[in-house]
Amino acid sequence: MINRIRVVTLLVMVLGVFALLQLISGSLFFSSLHHSQKSFVVSNQLREQQGELTSTWDLMLQTRINLSRSAVRMMMDSSNQQSNAKVELLDSARKTLAQAATHYKKFKSMAPLPEMVATSRNIDEKYKNYYTALTELIDYLDYGNTGAYFAQPTQGMQNAMGEAFAQYALSSEKLYRDIVTDNADDYRFAQWQLAVIALVVVLILLVAWYGIRRMLLTPLAKIIAHIREIAGGNLANTLTIDGRSEMGDLAQSVSHMQRSLTDTVTHVREGSDAIYAGTREIAAGNTDLSSRTEQQASALEETAASMEQLTATVKQNADNARQASQLAQSASDTAQHGGKVVDGVVKTMHEIADSSKKIADIISVIDGIAFQTNILALNAAVEAARAGEQGRGFAVVAGEVRNLASRSAQAAKEIKALIEDSVSRVDTGSVLVESAGETMNNIVNAVTRVTDIMGEIASASDEQSRGIDQVALAVSEMDRVTQQNASLVQESAAAAAALEEQASRLTQAVSAFRLAASPLTNKPQTPSRPASEQPPAQPRLRIAEQDPNWETF
């Protein structure tokens, strides 16, 4: 039955019981404290009332004594004159009576206890009578009326006041003793309460200890012992704890963990055997891969050498194409310069033709002038012939002028013929020069096209050279990476051998667990030769220890 109670429920019950006990003990303590506080208030009130009333009674007695002394002095004074002593005694009586009245007012200001109401009323009545009598006595003595003073029945009032005061004191004392008795009873009752509560607490502690031992400690000890067996490798025993408490849940969790651990150990045993076989195959495959990688590295090295030769040839072709392009550019510049010179010659020939035409025009003018001169000379000769002897000399001059004009005309004709021939030749030369200029322009255009083609050839050769350089660099990189692959394959072979050894150790370690079923027998493991014993490849190129291109490749 107790195993079905959960630990949390038990703890809540124990805490609830303790809380209830604490509440009960607190209530009892509060009640006792309240009663004690009430008793203390009552006692303090009784003490204050008793003190004020006692002071009132003492001061009233002192007033009566002072009045009696004053009356005696007045009787002893034969002249019945008020002396200083009488006046002082009367003043003292008035003061003490006033003080008594003050204390009695304080007494009346405090509400009387229910047990003291009747006594307080009796005292109040007797006080008023006695106070009035003392006031009258003071007046009598003040006026020197000793007869009235001695005739007043003050002593009876004083005795009545004294009896009332004594009754009040007895009632107050009785009430105080009752309070002390009640406090003593409350103290003994509190002791019994504490004893009972302590006994109940001890019983509850015993019950709680039994429940905790039965529900928590004993199952926990079994679980710890079972966990220690599991830690020692014994997975064959089973853990059984009845109940639906937290310990039962913990036992089920430990059993579930044991079953899971048993399955894990079984799978690890099977997996370690498979890993052992797989690592042997991996080691053999890595050895074969290492050999083929070395062969690939050799082939890549030869390819790299061929690419270097091809790179040198392409670079030479590119240099030749670049030189041819430069020569074609120079020829293009020369042809362009020649074309400019021919253009100048054509321009000059046109200018010469224009000048020849102008000279021909001038010669035509000269020819016209010679013709006019010849006509004028002829007219002059005719006029000289008409003049006869007087005009003979003038006729001779006219004849000479005519000869000169004829000769000038003949010379002008010859010069004109020569100039026309020269102009004709200049026109022919201009046509030829223009044809030569067009030919030079065609040559310049052809040379320019040749220059462009040679430039494109040179650029293409440069691109080919750079491409071949990149290919050669890639081949070299492939060669280097292949060398690295060879090293990595060797390391992988060594790692496979180490993994094989670790698998063997794992199998031996797992065999330490004892299962409920028939234990697995450890088959002998023959470790393969580690890859580190393989002859290392001799790299022909420098192999970098760390290279990010390995993943890219």
Curated annotation (Swiss-Prot):
Q: Name one Pfam family in it.
A: MCPsignal
Q: Glutamate methyl ester (Glu) occurs at which residues?
A: E302, E491, E500
Residue ranges annotated as transmembrane are 7-33, 191-211
Q: Which residues carry this modification: Glutamate methyl ester (Gln)?
A: Q295, Q309
Chain segments carrying region Disordered: 517-553
Compositional bias segments (type: Polar residues): 519-531
> Which PANTHER family does the record associate with it?
METHYL-ACCEPTING CHEMOTAXIS PROTEIN II (PTHR43531:SF16), PROTEIN ICFG (PTHR43531)
What is the name attached to this protein's record?
Methyl-accepting chemotaxis protein II
Q: Taking every annotated instance into account, which residue ranges of this chain make up the domain HAMP? A: 214-266
Membrane topology term reads: Multi-pass membrane protein
Q: What is the lineage of its organism?
A: Bacteria, Pseudomonadati, Pseudomonadota, Gammaproteobacteria, Enterobacterales
Q: Which gene encodes it?
A: tar
